[in-house]
Amino acid sequence: MTSPRARRGEIWLADLDPVRGNEQAGIRPVLVISATRVGVGPGGLAIVVPLTGTARTNDGAVAIPAGEGGLRRDSYALPVKLRSIARERLLARWGMARQETVDAVADRVRALVGIEPPRR
């Protein structure tokens, strides 16, 4: 079976189980933030930020409205839960997030790891 090829900015349904500790669990949408070339080749990975439908305001979550990228309800990207996953965990492509959303999530990730955001 061929693993799906995820592209930066796509929203996918993914199986994040099994998890440890406070990692985001379950089958849920994720936003791919890795450069598309990262997932190329056998054994490729995708760097993703899990999404939740629970309103979050105190941990750097980024709001994404229903309809964007195929989301069925208002959602929140959780940059603090960033992780690399095997492409085999990707179950179904839902759509593409707006560039502004991808940029906002990427900026939060940069802040988490201490990298200055690019000047726009």
Give the positions of each predicted feature.
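Conserved functional hotspots at enzyme active or ligand-binding sites that engage polyanionic ligands
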Residues: 1-120
